[in-house]
């Protein structure tokens, strides 16, 4: 059985990896953290896309037929372009998934007040990805997003558990 690739711009995606390992114990995983270029939140679409595509290709080269983008900014800025423009032409038998849609699917079920606060990078907040996805599944919720430029450094320094 092939390994599932998990990509993040740093260490934050290890929480996604831990959850995947618990839910899918029959699979092996390869984690790729791009700590040298983290954080991605303030970077342009082109930079995030290039870095994410590079990591995805490396995980494909390591034999992963599925790559999970555990990075919110990569999911917000690069996922759709990779899915719609790169995969059909170059890797039609491989898949790349992000974390925003699955999070948006369950967020409405978790709130009793229907008011949700989201702390994220500037790039994730500016993309409106969470608002666009969450309204599809839970149109009754009100999402409050706040860009926190210091969030990723706190996670990377292990001062906050994400």
Which residues fall in each region the model found?
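Non-catalytic structural scaffold of enzyme domains
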Residues: 1-162
